[in-house]
């Protein structure tokens, strides 16, 4: 999408991959020191070696320190950190560990609707029971415990719900859950004995005024031993999102909290089957959780680049909401975080009937027409799940500002034309 890579991350990666560059005076000293520290933690001082299945020990230690800083000093144990091939790998691994049983005793997993399709796909592959709970679109996609209770009680008629998945900030919905909401969810999980999976890969992507990222772990521990000693939690982060956007490195981690020792041994066996996560991805993760510090040569440039990326995304989030809400028949909630908007669109009844006659969801029909006539590619809301009778699409806010502005105006014009064409 034209985003310039973060210089520090690419410089350290370059040296790690080609250590001869340690002798090149073009690289700042802190870059060389960081690369050398990572290489010395690798087998044979090379990124080409296997690592321990749980990940390089030094990187896991740095991840723990990062979590402690993020969460205001709440302790994190490197032994509870599992490095992974992006967050997706550890999410699927955790689901494999948790899913069991047959028939009515089959594990049910509560997932938000709309959801990131990784979850529904993984549950289908594992033969788990998908239990949908709906986010509240009228309240900016907030999570409502009453809705969780409804979903859980309905599910208990045909499966054994054991797991609650949360995506915060949201994908595809771009919301940031409030601290109160997280506290309510933790109480609910404790009361119902649910394992919580907190997908927090967009934790750096917060744009809306008044919104803040609260990690599930931090809130859990601040609620005191009644909850922090009881609720089982796995939280996930990735190198693919945030300000870095280094998807191809496939770096990520999972932290587990309150996991029984015997179960944790089984988790370690499970991750050992895939040998180890990509070592270059582990190295990149280390640079992200242990970035340049004030006074170091790379600090000013690193912070300037990071703030520029996040500031630009915040401006595009505001722009997307503003332009789409200026179109009759499109309703776009504020993009509080993450990288997407998920606007609701009106589709005339004639277009709905035509789509159904062609075996298509109405929003897929709309998205295909949009692609054919404008070249703009968005994803139909039916691919993520939505309430019956509503239609949405997901679009990213990643294109450069001027291109995004033009794209949004063309999309707005197309929707108006579409409404006219298919209205009575």
Question: How should these model regions be labeled?
Answer:
Residues 1-54, 58-424:
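PLP-dependent class I/II
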């Amino acid at each position: 999408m034209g985003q310039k890579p973060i210089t520090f991350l690419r410089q350290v990666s370059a040296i790690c991959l080609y250590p001869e560059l340690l002798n090149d005076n073009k690289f700042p000293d802190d870059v060389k020191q960081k690369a050398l520290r990572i290489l010395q933690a690798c087998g044979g001082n090379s990124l080409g070696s296997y690592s321990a299945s749980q990940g390089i020990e030094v990187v896991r230690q740095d991840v723990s320190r990062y979590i402690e800083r993020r969460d205001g000093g709440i302790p994190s144990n490197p032994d509870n950190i599992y490095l992974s091939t992006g967050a997706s790998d550890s999410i699927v691994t955790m689901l494999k560990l948790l899913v069991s049983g047959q028939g009515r005793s089959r594990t049910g997993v509560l997932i938000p609707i709309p959801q990131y399709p990784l979850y529904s796909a993984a549950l289908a592959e594992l033969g788990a029971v998908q239990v949908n709970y709906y986010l509240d679109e009228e309240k900016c996609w907030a999570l409502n415990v009453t809705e969780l209770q409804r979903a859980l009680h309905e599910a208990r008629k045909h499966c054994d719900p054991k797991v609650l998945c949360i995506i915060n900030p949201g994908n595809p919905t771009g919301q940031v859950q409030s601290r109160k909401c997280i506290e309510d969810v933790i109480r609910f999980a404790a009361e119902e004995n649910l394992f919580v999976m907190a997908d927090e890969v967009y934790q750096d992507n917060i744009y809306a005024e008044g919104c803040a990222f609260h990690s599930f772990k931090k809130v859990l521990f601040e609620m005191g031993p009644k909850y922090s000693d009881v609720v089982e939690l796995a939280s996930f982060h990735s190198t693919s999102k945030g300000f870095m956007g280094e998807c191809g490195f496939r770096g990520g981690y999972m932290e587990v909290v309150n996991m029984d020792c015997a179960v944790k041994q089984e988790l370690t066996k499970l991750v050992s089957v895939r040998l180890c996560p990509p070592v270059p991805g582990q190295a990149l993760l280390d640079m992200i959780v242990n970035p340049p510090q004030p006074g170091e040569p790379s600090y000013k440039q690193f912070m300037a680049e990071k703030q520029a990326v996040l500031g630009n995304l915040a401006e595009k989030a505001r722009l997307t909401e503003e332009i789409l809400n200026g179109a009759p028949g499109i309703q776009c909630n504020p993009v509080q975080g993450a990288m997407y908007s998920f606007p609701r669109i009106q589709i005339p009844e004639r277009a709905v009937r035509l789509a159904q006659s062609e075996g298509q969801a109405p929003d897929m029909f709309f998205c295909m027409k949009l692609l054919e006539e404008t070249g703009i590619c968005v994803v139909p809301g039916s691919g993520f799940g939505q309430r019956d009778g509503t239609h949405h699409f997901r679009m990213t806010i990643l294109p450069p500002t001027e291109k995004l502005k033009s794209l949004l105006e063309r999309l707005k014009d197309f929707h108006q034309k579409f409404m006219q064409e298919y209205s009575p």
